[in-house]
């Protein structure tokens, strides 16, 4: 009898170990829902693939703060097209990084580019002739900001792939773009919330994919990962500046005055995609030229979505009134664009 119980115990432990191993394997959402290859380009071999830093294939599961940080810091040593700056630390001590990506020449001249942008922003100290010369000779600055809500996970994961694609691709289109543009990527604006939600994914992950959007693996549990350590919504803090993440971020953005800032979010699982232009009310302090260019970008985005046959909508609940969103930048002359996509978490 004792021998039988011992055998049953050993067998149970063995089966539990197998189940634990399966639980750690990535879910198969990406391969089932997205048939196109995510990273598809002509890449140099001297820069490590994102899989090097992950316990799974890129895109199969949510990457945590440590994995993303390790990747971009390593890439900064491997590529002359990338410069990484730490601009803040979260309440829990996690560093927040921003990645400057451009041609090697532009990266070497970042300080000069920033100084020229500062001159361009102040007509009191810059003549028309000097302003025209600056406009013709400096690259544009495009700021990409992701996952300010920690449980809206795809933004930070997308940022990881975008950084790799831009610094390692030999494609002519990418090379030409980086000669004319400095792409600034803030991959993870809320590391504390993201890691809190990533931990809940580990806790609720099953042995098989779960497509029920009411499941805890997709919704998480309180206090969720949307907010930072003190449960503050960082996408309400852009002009109040009460949180260290926001203070460092806004200071850096104000120094660079990008022409455009894209804010990547997720929304309900039953949704599709949403982008600009926003609905009314529009804050009367936003310059008309920004509204005009927002509509131009919106039309271009709509055409791109139509080519892919992706369903999307504009406006609806997205307004441009409150200055505490990322659209704070529009009160300083930058065009703000919101991207929203439906979420499944993992």
Please give the residue ranges for each predicted region.
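N-terminal secretory signal peptides that target proteins for export/translocation
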Residues: 1-2
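M14 metallocarboxypeptidase catalytic domain recognition
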Residues: 5-7, 20-346
């Amino acid at each position: 009898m004792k021998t039988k119980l011992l055998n049953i115990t050993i067998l149970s432990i063995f089966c539990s170990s197998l189940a634990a191993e399966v639980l750690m394997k990535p879910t198969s959402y990406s391969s089932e829902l997205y048939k196109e290859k995510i990273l598809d380009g002509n890449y140099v071999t001297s820069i490590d693939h994102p899989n090097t830093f992950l316990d799974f294939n890129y895109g199969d599961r949510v990457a945590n703060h440590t994995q993303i940080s390790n990747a971009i810091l390593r890439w900064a040593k491997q590529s002359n097209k990338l410069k990484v700056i730490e601009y803040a630390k979260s309440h829990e001590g996690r560093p927040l990084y921003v990645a400057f990506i451009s041609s090697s020449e532009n990266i070497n001249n970042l300080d000069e580019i920033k100084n020229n942008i500062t001159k361009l922003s102040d007509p009191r100290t810059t003549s028309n002739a000097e302003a025209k010369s600056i406009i013709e000779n400096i690259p544009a600055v495009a700021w990409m900001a992701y996952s300010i809500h920690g449980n809206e996970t795809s933004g930070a994961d997308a940022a990881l792939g975008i950084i790799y694609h831009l610094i390692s691709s030999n494609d002519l289109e990418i090379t030409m773009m980086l000669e004319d543009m400095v792409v600034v990527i803030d991959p993870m604006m809320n590391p504390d919330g993201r890691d809190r939600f990533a931990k809940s994914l580990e806790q609720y992950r099953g042995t098989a994919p779960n497509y029920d959007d009411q499941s805890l693996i997709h919704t998480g549990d309180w206090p969720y990962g949307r907010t930072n350590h003190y449960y503050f919504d960082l996408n309400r803090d852009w002009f109040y500046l009460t949180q260290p993440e926001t203070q460092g971020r806004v200071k850096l953005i104000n120094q660079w005055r990008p022409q455009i800032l894209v804010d990547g979010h997720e929304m309900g699982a039953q949704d599709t995609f949403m982008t600009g232009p926003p609905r009314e009310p529009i804050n009367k302090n936003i310059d008309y030229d920004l509204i005009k260019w927002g509509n131009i970008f919106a039309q271009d985005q709509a055409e791109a979505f139509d080519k892919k046959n992706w369903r999307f909508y504009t406006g609806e609940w997205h307004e441009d009134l409150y200055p505490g969103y990322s659209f704070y930048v529009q009160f300083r002359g930058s065009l703000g664009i919101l991207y929203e996509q439906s979420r499944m978490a993992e």
